[in-house]
Amino acid sequence: PGTPYLYTALVRFGKDEYRQKFGFRSVEVSGHKFLINGAPFYFKGPCKHEDSAFRGRGYDACVTVTDLKLYEWLNANALRMSHYPYAEEVYDLCDRLGIVVIDETPAVGIGAGTACDPYQTFPLKTYHSAVLRAMIERDKNHPCVVLWSLGNEPDTEHFPESARDYWRPLYELSLIHISEPTRQEA
């Protein structure tokens, strides 16, 4: 974090060339401490949406670079992708700037304010599993990503058994699909 060291892999095939940046880091939880490269790490940073007042929703390179530089100026070191995976270019920038990322699936407020059991009524799990798999597959090689967030503020209070049956397999899926043992889940 803060001062990343990235390597560049170069692949040539005939006249074609492809360059890919990559880095190494370790992540672990020891007791109550979150460690990156063996050192305690304290998450300081915002949740944000990919939008701006003057450009609208979606990825915008100028807005993103400006925002990330402002976060550095504020002494932030982490960014939660709320509440969906961002454009891949954002992860590339976070890799280069040493900003730690909590990657999140687009599962916001499942069941919040509903009278029926959302985990039994709506066919969400198949879609949610597919989105989680796609996010992990796409972002697993970004050294900036240190946590997978399965969702935002789900209602687990009103239907606890259904919620457990819904979230447990997704949590296990995130564990199975981690290609390296140094990624954590939220």
Predicted features by range, described:
Residues A115-L124, G151-L173:
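Active-site cleft segment of glycoside hydrolase catalytic domains centered on the general acid/base Glu
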Residues E50-R55, I110-A115, P154-H158:
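A short acidic, helix-capping loop that chelates divalent metal ions and anchors anionic groups
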Residues V27-V29, P154, P181:
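Hydrophobic pocket-lining residues within nucleotide cofactor-binding pockets
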Residues P85-A87, A107-G109, N152-T156:
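Solvent-exposed loop/turn segments at secondary-structure junctions
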